[in-house]
């Protein structure tokens, strides 16, 4: 993960930063593992007016992992709106990361978009 200070410098948005101190050591390890394992599995990324959406295959294990990641992410980044959506007829799973003005710049810096 990118350091808090480098995110602030890259994004130019000082009000958005990951507060990893909001998680204990075990949660930080798990968060890092889930980010590394799950995010590369996205099939598509869409830019939204207030953030980004990532399409994943419809898979129960993947959905459970994304749900756990969303819960941990909310601890360190409470300014994000995190939506996990299963679409009808066994369609894809969407993970949406959105928020107030400036969140999109933060996400670009954090995710290297």
What are these regions (language model features)?
Residues 1-63, 83-90, 94-113:
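Secretory/periplasmic and organellar redox-cofactor proteins
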Residues 71-80, 111-113:
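A common structural junction motif
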Residues 63-71:
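Amphipathic, interaction-prone secondary-structure segments
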């Amino acid at each position: 993960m990118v350091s808090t200070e480098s995110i602030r410098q890259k994004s130019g948005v000082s009000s958005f930063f990951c507060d990893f101190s909001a998680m204990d050591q075990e949660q930080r390890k798990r968060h890092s593992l889930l980010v590394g394992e799950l995010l590369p599995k996205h099939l598509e990324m869409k830019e939204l007016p207030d953030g980004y959406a990532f399409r994943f295959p419809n898979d129960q294990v993947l959905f459970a992992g994304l749900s756990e990641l969303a819960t941990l992410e909310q601890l360190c980044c409470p300014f994000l709106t995190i939506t996990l959506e299963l679409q009808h007829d066994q369609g894809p799973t969407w993970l949406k990361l959105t928020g107030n003005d400036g969140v999109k710049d933060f996400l670009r810096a954090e995710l290297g978009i």
